[in-house]
Regions:
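Acidic helix N-cap motif at the loop->helix transition within catalytic regions
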Residues: 6-10, 33-42, 85, 89
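Short, acidic, metal-binding catalytic loop of nucleotide-sugar glycosyltransferases
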Residues: 13-22
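Active-site donor/metal-binding and catalytic loop motifs
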Residues: 112-114, 185-211
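A conserved acidic beta->alpha catalytic loop
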Residues: 14, 28-38, 57, 81
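Glycine-rich, basic loop-to-helix element that forms the pyrophosphate-binding segment
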Residues: 55-72
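Acidic donor-binding loop at a coil-to-helix junction in glycosyltransferase catalytic cores
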Residues: 161-172
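Conserved donor NDP-sugar-binding/catalytic core segment of glycosyltransferases
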Residues: 89-121
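Short aromatic/hydrophobic "clamp" motif used to bind/position activated sugar donors
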Residues: 77
Length: 263
C-alpha cells in the first residue's frame, strides 16, 4: 500500500473477517502519510494473523506485491489493493476452487465498481468494458504461490512503474502458458467479489476510455508496447523452460565427461 491511511482499515477488516485465512501481510511501499502508523495497529489487535512489512522507499506496486509473496509461506496467495475490499466468503471460495481444480494455477475474482463515474456505467457496452477491467487489474488475482514464484512474480520493470500494466503483462503470460479461472462469468457469483472503490486516477478508467470510447493513451509509444510484450514473452519462456526441466525423460544423476584442450 502507498499513502493509503484513509482506506487501509476498510481493506484489512474485509480480510480479517474471511474464513480460510492463514495470515495478512500488509506491505507499506514507502508511504509519506500515516499509513505505517495505521498499519501497525493491526498486529496488536490480531497478533497471530497480521504482519506489517515496511519497504524503505517507494518501489512500485509490483515490488510490494512480490515482497508480500516472498514473506508469506502460504500455498495460495491473494492480492488486495489497499483502497478495495473483499465481499464475504471470497477466500473460502478461492480456497475451494483451488482444491477442486488442482489444474488451475491462478484465479481472477469478480470486481464490483463502487462510486464509478456515471459516464462509464451508463455506456451501453459497459459490461463488455468492465470484463476487460476484471481481466486486467491485479487486485482481484489469486495464485498458487509456487506458480507465481516460477513466473518471477509481478514484473518490476521501470516501464510499468511509469505506465502501469505489470498485472497485464503477467496475466497475458499466464493465459499463454496455462489456465486462469474466472469467477465472474457465472451470474451466481456476483456476491463473491472484490469491491473496487473508484478514484479519479485509477488505471481502470484509462482502460475503459480505450475500450468504450476509443481513446488511446498518448503516453504509451510503440516501443513501450514492444517492451511490455517482451516482458510477457520472457515470462512465458521461463515457464516453458521450467516445464522442460521437470518433464525430462531421463531423471537423476547425469555424469559429465570433460575433455581439456591441449595446451
Amino acid at each position: 500500500c502507498y499513502n493509503a491511511a484513509l482506506t487501509l482499515e476498510r481493506a484489512v477488516m474485509s480480510v480479517v473477517l474471511q474464513t480460510h485465512l492463514q495470515h495478512i501481510i500488509i506491505v507499506d511501499d514507502g508511504s509519506r502519510d500515516h499509513t505505517v502508523a495505521t498499519a501497525q495497529r493491526f498486529p496488536a489487535a490480531y497478533p497471530n494473523k497480521i504482519r506489517v512489512a515496511c519497504l524503505p522507499q517507494n518501489g512500485g506496486v509490483a515490488r510490494a506485491r512480490n515482497w508480500g509473496m516472498l514473506v508469506s509461506n502460504a500455498e495460495i496467495v491473494a492480492f488486495l489493493d489497499a483502497d478495495d475490499a473483499y465481499q464475504a466468503q471470497v477466500l473460502a471460495f478461492s480456497h475451494a476452487v483451488m482444491q477442486f481444480r488442482p489444474d488451475l494455477p491462478a484465479l481472477r475474482l469478480g470486481l464490483i465498481p463502487v462510486d464509478l463515474d456515471a459516464k462509464y456505467s451508463a455506456h451501453p457496452q459497459f459490461d463488455y468494458g468492465w470484463r476487460h477491467v476484471e481481466m486486467t487489474v491485479g487486485g482481484n488475482m489469486v495464485f498458487r504461490r509456487a506458480f507465481l514464484l516460477a513466473c518471477g512474480g509481478f514484473p518490476q520493470d521501470e516501464l510499468f512503474r511509469r505506465l502501469g500494466g505489470e498485472d497485464v503483462a503477467l496475466g497475458l503470460a499466464v493465459l499463454a502458458s496455462s489456465q486462469m479461472g474466472t469467477a465472474f462469468d457465472d451470474v451466481g457469483l456476483d456476491e463473491i467479489a472484490v469491491l473496487h472503490h473508484c478514484r479519479p486516477d485509477m488505471y481502470a478508467y484509462k482502460l475503459l476510455d480505450g475500450v468504450l470510447f476509443g481513446l488511446g493513451r498518448s503516453d504509451i509509444t510503440k516501443a513501450d508496447q514492444q517492451e511490455a510484450q517482451a516482458v510477457t514473452d520472457g515470462i512465458v519462456s521461463r515457464l516453458q523452460q521450467l516445464h522442460q526441466w521437470l518433464h525430462t525423460e531421463h531423471k537423476g544423476k547425469v555424469p559429465l565427461k570433460v575433455e581439456l584442450a591441449p595446451k
